[in-house]
Amino acid sequence: LLDNPLIRNGIMQSQHFKTISAYWDNLDVALVGIGSPAIRDGANWHAFYGGEESDDLNARQVAGDICSRFFDIHGAMVETNMSEKTLSIEMNKLKQARYSIRIPMSEEKYSGIVGALRGKYINCLVTNSSTAELLLK
């Protein structure tokens, strides 16, 4: 997440970024985490997104994120004012990976996991027994 879209666009035009992002077209395995606004009071979430951005995500009913790409409980992508400042793999490229693996393990991640499953952003889920039991209810 960059300070403004101009920085993001400049980086995206660089040859170094183009070389790296070309690999995204041929991913075999993607191993990434799932974020959740339910953990917004946590130090990491607050440090990364801040209070104002967190409030905006809640207002837009964001269920979770993968690589700062936000989605709702139904799996639909949610555009935010951070979208144009985000420099990360696009969700459609993650969905093309042969194995798209997520390893979330807490009740706080429930809405993010459900949204990711419904959006088909996951084809392999590794979690603990308590989170799995919650998902099966």
Question: Where are the regions a protein language model picked out?
Answer:
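Conserved phosphate- and dinucleotide-binding cores of soluble alpha/beta proteins
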Residues: L1-K137
